[in-house]
Amino acid sequence: MSVDNNNKAKQAYNNQTGVNEKEREEQQKQAEQYREQNEQQQFENKLTFSDEVVEKIAGIAAREVKGILDMKGGFADNFTNAFSSGNNVTTGVSVEVGEKQAAIDLKVILEYGESAPKIFRKVTELVKEQVKYITGLQVVEVNMQVDDVMTKKEWQQKNEKNNNNNNNNSERSGLQ
């Protein structure tokens, strides 16, 4: 009985002085939650990707789709490729990258006889999948512009001609 009397006396004292055990525990819990929130706000982690990284991912993914012979760049890409090996995977790809989303534009050369709508669906699916998997970014838009249509043979002949021209230019300038 003395334990009950002791608890009653303690409870009466706490009530008189305004100290309530449950209230005190609740206040401590709220203070701890507040501290945790402040710590989380102070140490905010961030993962970002440059536009060039997303361009590379999209360019590699698009080239994997059957029916895409090549990607076609603008003047700057053509100028850059004239002085390089021509294996720039970002050629024909431009992107806008936000914190959580990306929009991708592609300029392609299609193989004659292939269905552009089917290729577009496959490219869209693969590009979205790869960008999401590698970066975590949601691709909200994929636009594909068909700049040329060639037979595979025609495309190979054009590439052989370009490779021969690049090799001749390298030899003339002393580059290897």
From Swiss-Prot:
Pfam families: Asp23 (PF03780). Residues 1-43, 154-176 are annotated as: Disordered. Residues 20-38 have a biased composition (Basic and acidic residues). Residues 1-16 have a biased composition (Low complexity). May play a key role in alkaline pH tolerance. Belongs to the asp23 family. This is Alkaline shock protein 23. The gene is asp23.
